[in-house]
Amino acid sequence: MKTFMASPATIDRKWYVVDAEGKTLGRLASEVAKVLRGKNKAIFTPHIDTGDYVIVVNADKVKVTGKKLDQKIYYHHSDYIGGMKETTLREMMNKHPERVIEYAVKGMLPKGPLGRQMYTKLFVYAGPDHKHAAQKPETLEF
């Protein structure tokens, strides 16, 4: 018996919608990353993108534990000398709540071209509405 290896032509992708309201950030992100990678499928192949599309709604209502709202800091650089910028989780949730989930999930995906391809199948929205009704997404519960 040979080991099954999926090929891009044999992959059947589904669309899932996840409601982030009341869910803990890290636990939600790890489950979403598993679906994006395809680890929940029997045909998972490490070097092929076998994952499904995931839509996350209500990103502004995700919860975090402890003092992370004030102590978790996101860093970025302006490419100028002394241009290190920092933003707390509270500021990020007020300005761009969808980026919080995007950064958390992106950090849990493989680094490299395959991980970047998987990341393109993630869609995050701050409110309860999304523009992917034509894909008929199924609700995914964790």
UniProtKB/Swiss-Prot annotation:
SUPFAM superfamilies: Ribosomal protein L13. InterPro entries: Ribosomal_uL13, Ribosomal_uL13_bac-type, Ribosomal_uL13_CS, Ribosomal_uL13_sf. Keywords: Ribonucleoprotein, Ribosomal protein. Pfam families: Ribosomal_L13. GO terms for cellular component: cytosolic large ribosomal subunit. One of its GO terms (biological process) is negative regulation of translation. GO terms for molecular function: mRNA binding; structural constituent of ribosome. The keyword Ribonucleoprotein applies. The keyword Ion transport does not apply. NCBIfam families: rplM_bact. Belongs to the universal ribosomal protein uL13 family. Part of the 50S ribosomal subunit. This protein is one of the early assembly proteins of the 50S ribosomal subunit, although it is not seen to bind rRNA by itself. It is important during the early stages of 50S assembly. This is Large ribosomal subunit protein uL13. The lineage of its organism: Bacteria, Bacillati, Bacillota, Clostridia, Lachnospirales.
